[in-house]
Amino acid sequence: MMKRSEKAKELFLKGYNCSQAVLGAFCDVIGFEFDQAMRLASSFGGGVARMRHICGTCSAMFMIAGLMRGYTVHEAKAKSEHYAFIQSMAKEFEARNGSLICRELLDSRAKLSKTVDNGSGPEANERTTEYYRARPCLSIIEDAVILTCKMLSIPNEIDA
């Protein structure tokens, strides 16, 4: 057994983006094959395609919540209840991390060096020791998984 939060960090360290790392740690509960989850989350890393908008971990949290308790019938009450739940997840994430925005999370919490590109172009950074050292992403990934487990009543333990 291992913790989902550790699984997510392991995925990030293997080169998956932040959104893929979080979503990949929940494949067993959302009913997705790993490759399917990786494709779905592939667009959301780096704050949506590295544009530094909403944090990819948040996108993954909201996808998991939608798959587990989202609405399917176009009914105002169900939609409102779901949106209220997602907003509560977002508010909790923001309270714990200071922002939902990738750029703000990187700027306020990272110790970026001149050798690490924090830009918003489409070119992916090489994953180096400096890349991981300069970013708060691992702790944010861990927190997003723990928050998702808490708010959706999912155990943090997973079969490895």
Regions found by a protein language model. Give the residues of each.
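Polybasic, low-complexity association/targeting segments
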Residues: 1-14
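Glycine/serine-rich anion-binding loops at beta->alpha junctions
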Residues: 16, 44-63
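Phosphate-handling active-site elements
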Residues: 29-39, 65-88, 156
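RNase III-family endoribonuclease catalytic core
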Residues: 52, 78, 93-94
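C-terminal binding/interaction regions
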Residues: 86-160
